[in-house]
Every structure is written in C-alpha cells, then in structure tokens.
Amino acid sequence: MEYAFRWELKGGENRQAAARRLLHEALRRGAVGAVLFPAEARGGAGVAYALATRVEHLGSAVPLARAVPQFGPQNLVRATEPGGGPIAVAAVLKPCEVRAVVELVKLKQVAPSRVVLLSPDCPGTVELKDYARTRDESEDALPLRLACRICRRPVGGEGADVSLGTLGARHDELLLVARTDRGRAFCESVGAQAVEVPPTRAEAVARAVAAGEAAHAAQEAASRERYAKGGAFVPALSTCIKCMNCMNVCPVCYCKECLFYTDAFNPTAGSLADKAKRRGVLRVPTETVQFHLTRMAHVMTACVMCGQCESACPTGIPLVEMYAGINKRIQDLFGYESGRSVDEPQPFTEFREDEEFG
C-alpha cells in the first residue's frame, strides 16, 4: 500500500532546496542518525556521495542532482555492515541504485532494518564530467547517458521506502510516496502533510515507464542483432586495458575475494613468461575478453542496468549496449527481474524441482 505526503516548497525554494530541507529535518528531528546523499563539490565541478550526521554539513546536498555519483550502494554496505555503530541511515539513491540495494540485501550485504531508502523520480542523468554544465545550460539540452535513455524503471518502485516524487506532482511540492511502514514513519517524523495519492501520479509514472520500455526494447533488438554471432563483440572489447573500473564501480559486484585478482587473470611475472612461451605470443594485458565474459556471467541476473560500468570505462567500451542485448533476456528465462522485490530469491540461490525456463 502507498501513503502520500506533501512536502511543500517554501519561501521561493526550488525542488532541490526543498529536498535538502527534508534531509535537514530528518537529522534535526532525529528521524535518522545519518544521511547518505549526493553532495556538490566546491564550485559545482562534480558530485560525490557524503555521509553526514550533523545538519550543518548538508549545505552541499543536491538530492535531485542530474548525475549519478559512484559507489552509492557500496557506501551503504560500509555504513551498515556488522561491526559498525548501530545508526539509522537515510540514503538518497537513484532508482537504479535502489534496485541494486535490493539485490545486496538478498546477498546479506546491507542491513535493511537500519536504512530508510529515499529515491527521487529520475528524469535521467548526465555523465559526471558534464555535471558542471547543468548549472549553466538547459538540462534538457545535455546528452543523457545511454543507460538512462533506455531505463525501464525511472521511479524507486517496491524497494524504496519513500519516493521523492516529481512525476504527477504539483509544481509547488515534492510528493513523498511511502511504500513501507518505515517510510511512512519517516514522512510523519519530518512533519510532512498526509494527502491522497493524486491520480496524476499513476498516469505520469505509467507514461514514463512505457517510454522507457519502448526505448529499451528498441536498443535490445539492435544490440542482439549486432552481437548475436559474436563478430562485433571481440572488436568492441579490443580497447580494454583491464583497469577493472567496470568491476570496481559495479554496485552488485560484491565479492571480497575475487577471481580477477588471482593468477588466472592477474598473472605474476613468472606465469606471464610461461604463458608467452606456450602460446608464442601473448597480448598484454591478458584475458581481456575472458574478463568481460566472466563478469557478464557473474552479474547478469543481478544487473540493474545502471550504466556505471560504461561511465567508468576510460576507453569508451559500449558496455550498456552489450548488456542491453542480454540482460533482460537472461532474467526473463528465470522469470526474474533484478531489484523488483527483496522477497524474490536470486535465480542461482534456490533450487526448484519443477523449474521451467521461459
């Protein structure tokens, strides 16, 4: 069940300032002990996550930033993992990041009882390097990341405790849509006004979802046609320098001990020479194609199509384009959608005797 609350814009505020005030009230009133939020760098050159426990440190907060800082879900893991202080955290995350957190909860990486997930409706984001331009140019004129242009889930969905709604909301408000008792309690504790969910909300969300589904379907078809026989796959990966940025920023790549840091993928000087002797010639860095194939197999059922992998790639490998051709197809085989529900087991974590593949 959804509960709606009105967070009114005050004194000439825009929605960004109103969302910042919401975080301020959450800390001031003790609704949570800490807030994880996107913070603008000095001069507005970029945006990164910050974890604040005092209201005076919220001045740089940009909860509705049109860019995705890296490591949001990973920071939430660190803030709630066993051994840390028992502090309740309100985390402002994009819808794709919320879906990643849902997957991490299933993998016992995040303690959900200590987190209130706040997720702004997302109209799409630009690359971090372009963030400064959002201050000087029309946001609609800036190119959105491909992952955002084909996003099928632009709202927080079931995984979010509270959506910071702009879709279907009045121009003078943020519509706080709570989906959990924890989210409802948060909205009440900050003094938001309870209202009915307006019919414009469902209509606006449905339009955004339909547009995303259509864009994703078109990209999926194009990607499958391009990569179906593998002919374009290896050339597309030819510029890989195996920096592992894609792996390091991936929100669902959670293993503490990783195959890619073993001798199989990260050979020592001696084993590198042995491989060169056996093969006669050896491309270095080694096993770049195998690296991507292994990563793809490892994360595909949990992938939320956030696009962080492509954004972090220094050589511009079209990873979102590649994943778009296989991500939904693999998940559909298991009747699964990553990040849809915390109660939905991941495909490879349970056994069904009567399992059928779609």
Feature locations, PLM:
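A general structural signal for well-ordered secondary-structure junctions
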Residues: 32-33, 111, 246, 309, ...
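Local cysteine-cluster metal-coordination motifs and their immediate loop/turn environment
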Residues: 94-99, 143-155, 238-259, 300-316
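Detector for Asparagine
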Residues: 14, 75, 245-248, 266, ...
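Iron-sulfur-associated redox domains of electron-transfer enzymes in respiratory
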Residues: 1-233, 237
